[in-house]
UniProtKB/Swiss-Prot annotation:
Biased composition regions of type Low complexity, renumbered to the chain: 315-330
Comp. bias intervals (Polar residues): 338-349, 366-383
Compositional bias of kind Basic and acidic residues: 350-365, 656-671
Record keyword Secreted present: no
Sites of Phosphoserine modification: S25
Identification of the protein by name: Altered inheritance of mitochondria protein 44
Amino acid sequence: MIIRAPIRTKTKSFRGDQMDFKFPSNESLPRGTLEEYHLNNHHLLNDVFAAENGVSRDEDGNSQILSDYTSTSNTNTNSGYSSNGYYSFANISDNTTSSPRIVINQNETARLTSSDSNKSDFFASHDFPGNDSLHYSSSSVVKNQLHSMEAIPEGNITGSISTAFQTIPTADNVSYDIAPSSASSLLPRKSTSKSAILPSTQEAKPMTKLNMEKDIKTIELNNSVVPKPKKKLNRVPTIRRVESSRFSNSRYSSSVSSKSSSSRCSLKRSKAIRCKGGLLYYFTSLGIKIKKKLRKLRLVLRRRLFSYNVQKVPSATNSKTTKSKANINNKSKKRGTNLVNKNSNSTPRLDTKFKANHPQSEDSKVGSNTPRSPLVSYTPSLRRTNSSIRRAASILTASATMTPANNKNSFISVPDNVSHAVTRNSSMYSRSRLVRSKPSTALNAIARQPSIVVENKVIPLSMNRYSIKEEDEYVIDTSSMRELSPVNSVCSSDYDRESSESYSNYADAMETTEVDNKDRVECNNEIQNVNANNEETSNEESYNLMKHYLSTVIAQRIMLRVQIARIQNNKSNVVYMNKSAETNSTIYEDLADSLLTEYEADGSSSQIFDGVSVRADEEEEEDEDDEDDEEEEEENDDEEDEEDEEDDEDDEEEEEKRKEGEGRNLAKEVDELAELSPMRKQSDLSITLRSPFAMLNSAYSNSIISLPTGVVKRSLTLPVGMKI
């Protein structure tokens, strides 16, 4: 049996087995709305860690703020302590210096001395209780009183006396030190330039009684100047590296004076540290000074622009009581509205950097944050990129509240009064069966529990595991399958009435089983007999009707183009613009009138077949519009005969149509039109098509397209215009 165990059981972040620590389950969390403090688990980590080991306050590897870069378990860094991803130095504490030893004096301060030089480091003994064994690491010694990252002077080769402010920070013992909120108030400005900084002596002398007394005095001075650091991190940790300008000038003087003692000192310096001084130090200090000045300017401008008077601004509790009194008494509604407006206008925007000054208790641990000041980690995590966080925290297309409750296939039940909100992934209100995401089509993205990202950690918001119902997306309904009876095409309207009464062409499969086979055979025989009789007549009628229709349309279009061509011709324009004696109007006016009357008519006044029927039956009386149309057609026929003789005056379109032979056969077709007088009586042009989707009881179950001839008009752009 294979037992799964982590490969690396010890990490620096927990100082113990990984399996000892368990994240608190979501069942222990309150069910109400959770703030960011409760969703964040930094304080839980620190409490568990502090309960297991008593740890010094300022040790940086313990906190989870910079866990990716400062932990030695991280394999992606260059050295064990990668100095938080910034400039890394050569680690000279490996093989060049001798191992330090710890001396504990009577006045309860431990001194770290190296045998090679008379260099001594002092650190407070309250960090190491007497009961525990001294877990000494070179980083904890320096960090206890180095509250800001000290820049290393260029030529500083250890003087005989070095205080806590002037040590050699290496990559092992000092990565960037995180200054707490009280770090700015740790060092008073007056005392740093004189008493806190001791000049380094030029000559290294052996330790005498006088030097020992001086050392004790310097220890007392340092302990009096540097107070104990406060224990809480109440704001965003900042990286402080450089002090005031006086301090930097004195640092340079001490570094220059210590060059003479370089021959007597046995400590080796690597070239990687020498590059830290000089221009790099100058520009970093200059940049920090400029930032401080800009922040002061910003504060001054804010105070003047946004009226920073604290006395005028009423507190939150007073405003709440005044609002409640106004609501209860209902006497001073106007005053209440004025107070609300004043509160909203005069309250300044608070900066999170200057907000967090709270009374602090000694029992609180490092890194435990209050709900008012959330910790923000600026180092990007190696395990989490932006895309992975988006992938893990996205609830596909929309949040769980977006799926409607009345949907049968939705696996999340939602109240009905859901506002149709527009979320990042779904612009439309999602009515789909499965909640899908636009970018990914993976199977694991179909349904995922809602989650939130706090400090680059994905925290699920529910313990429910939604099960996906196994349903087919493409449902085949067997009730919609129907057996189709044989399709029969019938053209006569008389038979349509008989067939609709006697036999339903598209009966349901269940209904047709009840009908006997004898009835089916009889119906089929009747249908075949009727079809045989009607096919001959219907074929002849449809042929004659379509021939008559197309010939008249083609003839009228040719006549119209002849008229337009002659009007556009300059030579014959004078003749045709003169008024004719018969109609007392020009040909151009007749053409315009004929066009207008046809388009204004509703299909009754200017019909193609009516004009043809007048030639067959001269006895019928017609309107004036129809007579004008007939006269135009007779004139245009004569003009077309003349046009056949004069080919030079015609357009290209007329020549193409003559090549096809339409102009030659036009006279014959006009003569045949007189023989089609019975066509006028039958006024329906029916194209019969049968489909299985036709309605059973409708009048149009016989044919999809039914065209009465009165609806068909002549068009200038299209060959035929129809209303279906």
